[in-house]
C-alpha cells in the first residue's frame, strides 16, 4: 500500500476524547499536496469542519489537525490511523485541550463509487 492508495472519501464514526465517550459521525476526504503529504478535510455532523496535514509510512497514517469552535477558539490535535486496508482505517486521536485521561477513537470506511460496486 502507498500513500496514493489512501486518496479518497471515507465515512467516519467515532467517539470523543471525554469520559462520556460521546459519539459522532461524518465524512473524511483525503488528498495529496505537491509533496505527497496527506491533506485531510473532515466534515463532522452538519456544521463542524476540521482540516489537517499528515504523512504515511508502513501502514500508519499520522495527521496533525485543527478546527475553530463557534466561540473562535482554535483546537489542535493529532490522529493516528492504522491502515488495515486501503479502504478501512482504524484510529485514535487526542486534542491539546481534551481530557488527558482519555483518547478519542475513529474508524473510517472508504465510500465506493457506484460503478466500483458493480464491477
What are these regions (language model features)?
Residues 1-119:
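Central antiparallel beta-sheet cores of small beta-barrel/beta-sandwich binding domains
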Amino acid at each position: 500500500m502507498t500513500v496514493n492508495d489512501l486518496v479518497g472519501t471515507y465515512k467516519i464514526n467515532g467517539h470523543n476524547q471525554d469520559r462520556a465517550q460521546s459519539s459522532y459521525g461524518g465524512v473524511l476526504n483525503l488528498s495529496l499536496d505537491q509533496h505527497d503529504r496527506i491533506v485531510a478535510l473532515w466534515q463532522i455532523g452538519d456544521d463542524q469542519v476540521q482540516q489537517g496535514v499528515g504523512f504515511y509510512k508502513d501502514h500508519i497514517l499520522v495527521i496533525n489537525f485543527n478546527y475553530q469552535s463557534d466561540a473562535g477558539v482554535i483546537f489542535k490535535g493529532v490522529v493516528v490511523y492504522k491502515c488495515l486496508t486501503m479502504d478501512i482505517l482504524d484510529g485514535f486521536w487526542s486534542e491539546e485541550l481534551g481530557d488527558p485521561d482519555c483518547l478519542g477513537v475513529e474508524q473510517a470506511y472508504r465510500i465506493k463509487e457506484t460503478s466500483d460496486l458493480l464491477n
